[in-house]
């Protein structure tokens, strides 16, 4: 059976943490930032975890992670 391929878009967007949760970047931080407050932009700065209901589909996209 051939090797499974990792989705290139998923490997650029997600990473697996040591505890098994999946790390992702925050959305809404690329452009149109002038109308957003400093507080909103500060909260969007850090990474967050993928929701547990979406984690299975993300893991299927990255079989060797």
Swiss-Prot record:
One of its GO terms (biological process) is translation. Pfam families: Ribosomal_L35p. One of its GO terms (cellular component) is cytosolic large ribosomal subunit. Residues 1-15 have a biased composition (Basic residues). SUPFAM superfamilies: L35p-like (SSF143034). Residues 1-21 are annotated as: Disordered. One of its GO terms (molecular function) is structural constituent of ribosome. This is Large ribosomal subunit protein bL35.
């Amino acid at each position: 059976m051939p090797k499974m391929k990792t989705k290139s878009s998923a490997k650029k967007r997600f990473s697996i943490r040591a505890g098994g949760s999946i790390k992702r970047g925050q959305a809404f931080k690329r452009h149109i930032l002038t109308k957003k407050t400093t507080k909103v932009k500060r909260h969007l700065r850090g990474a967050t975890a993928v929701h547990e209901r979406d984690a299975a589909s993300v893991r299927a996209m990255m079989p060797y992670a």
